[in-house]
Design a protein with these regions (language model features):
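Secretory targeting and sorting signals
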Residues: 2-43
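Long, contiguous binding/interaction regions
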Residues: 3-4, 43-147, 154-263
């Protein structure tokens, strides 16, 4: 991906990001805090019913660092070959959504989905009809079969409504929405050496070694007036898929400000 990246119990796209940078965001998993004084119940950060959001999206959400709640589906229905290499679904061949509470009963959602060309218009139509905005449509790789696109989306408001819209849109693809949680095969690479070179600890995502490195600047979503948690498009992604013999296919994307693009 050439722009900001929305990319996680089993590791999800968000869980892989928190492991090496736990100190950058405070983990919170509150649902409802009750204050008994005077018989008044005060809802805290968890006044969004995340279980209801999971039911609407068709998959339990994982609670991550910074009060981010995520869901992921792998494109296990596709056999993708890029530059002669069979791509693992762990190389961002997926659909994902990250939610973050912004106000009582409200949330911001950022995500993306890998699509075949024939799926793009019908998914876009379903998202727009449900009030979810498309923020980017571009390619992550250039020599793949079948030809693929990556669609990024954004929404704010009632998270249950947003989740229903996402489920409706993803149902227009070939993604098996009822897929079980993926089992992570071991990464057949010298992960310790790569950790030293990258300067962070990678995480096994479906047999792919992934690094999510938060940007140093605070990234503000000016429409909802919040600083984005680094799990929501505020990190650089590097992926290493083992090929055997100590070799790897490498892919990823950089989150950058405009003045950083040419130097990088």
């Amino acid at each position: 991906m050439t722009g900001p990246h929305p990319r996680r119990p089993r590791a999800t796209p968000a869980q892989r990001r928190r492991q090496g940078f736990r100190g950058l965001a405070a983990a919170t998993g509150l649902t409802v805090v009750l204050a008994m004084a005077g018989g008044t119940a005060l809802a805290q950060a968890g006044d969004v019913d995340w279980n209801a959001v999971g039911r609407a999206i068709g998959r339990p959400l994982h609670t991550e660092a910074g009060d981010v709640h995520t869901a992921e589906w792998l494109r296990t229905d596709l056999r993708v070959v890029n530059a002669g290499v069979r791509e693992s679904p762990g190389m961002e061949l997926n659909a994902e959504a990250s939610f973050h509470r912004t106000a009582p009963g409200k949330a911001l959602m950022i995500g993306e989905v890998t699509l075949k060309g024939s799926e793009v218009n019908r998914v876009a139509d379903a998202l727009r009809q449900g009030g979810v905005e498309i923020t980017a449509l571009h390619k992550h790789i250039q020599d793949e079969t079948p030809r693929l696109w990556w669609m990024h989306y954004w929404a704010q408001g009632d998270p249950v409504r947003i989740a229903r819209t996402l489920h409706t849109a993803l149902a227009r693809t070939g993604i098996p929405l009822d897929q079980p949680e993926a089992v992570r095969p071991p990464v057949a690479l010298d992960t310790a050496a790569l950790d030293r070179v990258i300067g962070a600890k990678g995480e096994d995502e479906n047999g792919v070694l992934q690094y999510h490195i938060p940007v140093t600047e605070k990234i503000t979503d000016t429409r909802v007036h919040i600083t984005l948690p680094y799990l929501m498009e505020a990190s650089t992604l590097l992926m290493f898929q083992p090929l055997g013999g100590g070799r790897a296919a490498v892919n990823g994307d950089f989150a950058m400000t405009a003045d950083q693009v040419n130097p990088v």
